[in-house]
Amino acid sequence: MGFTEKQEALVNASYEAFKQNLPGNSVLFYSFILEKAPAAKGMFSFLKDFDEVPQNNPSLQAHAEKVFGLVRDSAAQLRATGVVVLADASLGSVHVQKGVLDPHFVVVKEALLKTLKEAGGATWSDEVSNAWEVAYDELSAAIKKAMS
């Protein structure tokens, strides 16, 4: 069974909940990443010169919005065509340049899900989590393919 209309709607609704507090949720997202992988700090230009995740940082917020938006867009692609095609062909080379490895994708996935759970509150469910996981896994597979 392919990605359903309901799954896409769940992703879209929780993405909107995430965006309602973009500054706070962005800090939360990168805090979760650094909690699991402190060495990843150097991969992000907006983090490498700070001891802690900076508050109200436009670059940090823009990158978080881009990451979550790419996963949301992947859900839409999965619903429409059943496959994820990268709109930005440079994503693979950027990830290679930054030294991203397979374990980093796992850390980001966990941080993304934890952030969405916090943002979604009572609306979070296994069904919402599963929809995001499928979309994220397909996006990360497309990025990894572009990295090789």
Swiss-Prot record:
Residue positions where Phosphoserine is found in the record: S45
Phosphoprotein found in the keyword field: yes
List of residues binding heme b: S45, K66, H95, K98
One Gene Ontology term of the molecular function aspect: metal ion binding
CDD domains, sorted: class1-2_nsHbs_Lbs
UniProt entry keywords in alphabetical sequence: Cytoplasm, Heme, Iron, Metal-binding, Nitration, Nitrogen fixation, Nodulation, Nucleus, Oxygen transport, Phosphoprotein, Transport
GO CC annotations on file: cytosol; nucleus
Post-translational modification: Nitrated in effective nodules and particularly in hypoxic conditions; this mechanism may play a protective role in the symbiosis by buffering toxic peroxynitrite NO(2)(-). Nitration level decrease during nodule senescence. Phosphorylation at Ser-45 disrupts the molecular environment of its porphyrin ring oxygen binding pocket, thus leading to a reduced oxygen consumption and to the delivery of oxygen O(2) to symbiosomes.
Keyword Protease part of the UniProt annotation: no
Top-rank taxon: Eukaryota
Tissue-level expression: Stem nodules.
Modified residues (Nitrated tyrosine): Y30, Y136
InterPro entries in the record: Globin, Globin-like_sf, Globin/Proto, Leghaemoglobin-like, Leghaemoglobin_Fe_BS
Domain Globin: start-end pairs: 2-148
Coiled-coil boundaries: none
Family per record: Belongs to the plant globin family.
Quaternary structure note: Monomer.
Role played: Leghemoglobin that reversibly binds oxygen O(2) through a pentacoordinated heme iron. In stem nodules, facilitates the diffusion of oxygen to the bacteroids while preventing the bacterial nitrogenase from being inactivated by buffering dioxygen, nitric oxide and carbon monoxide, and promoting the formation of reactive oxygen species (ROS, e.g. H(2)O(2)). This role is essential for symbiotic nitrogen fixation (SNF).
Protein name (Swiss-Prot/TrEMBL): Leghemoglobin 3
Name of the gene: GLB3
